[in-house]
Amino acid sequence: MSSKMIVLMSSDGQSFEVEEAVAIQSQTIAHMVEDDCVADGIPLANVESKILVKVIEYCKKHHVDEANPISEEDLNNWDEKFMDLEQSTIFELILAANYLNIKSLLDLTCQTVADMIKGKTPEEIRSTFNIENDFTPEEEEAVRKENQWAFE
């Protein structure tokens, strides 16, 4: 039995044929399918092809059914390897997951960033994310006092 296919079109003009059952992990796409708006393909104006490829890879792996069984542990291990990406790609995936409304991918990408921050000082976080400190020493001290609970 062949699956129904739909075409996703990236913002840079590339088309990807994907099983509908895989694509509807995106609530955005699921609503378009429900509204019967997929005949000519689905343009995804906010997602470039290099990111759409990663989103599709994620959705294919997370499309679990009788034909594609996978244990929770194997899926978690796969997710960990999947997120071994450059920072810029992780941030682009966050934007795509949010735009496409794929909660599990949004949770995974945001948790990855949270793990990059956890246990670090403000200086280490700035270094990790290449953020310039534009506070004066006085402003920084005021913020520390205001949020002292966070530094305990």
Curated annotation (Swiss-Prot):
Expressed in young seedlings, cotyledons, roots, leaves, floral stems, inflorescences, pollen, and siliques, with a slightly higher level in inflorescence than in other tissues. It is found in: Nucleus. GO terms for cellular component: nucleus; SCF ubiquitin ligase complex. Transmembrane segments: none annotated. The keyword Nucleus applies. Pathway: Protein modification; protein ubiquitination. Keywords: Nucleus, Ubl conjugation pathway. Belongs to the SKP1 family. This is SKP1-like protein 11. It comes from Arabidopsis thaliana (Mouse-ear cress). The lineage of its organism: Eukaryota, Viridiplantae, Streptophyta, Embryophyta, Tracheophyta. The gene is ASK11.
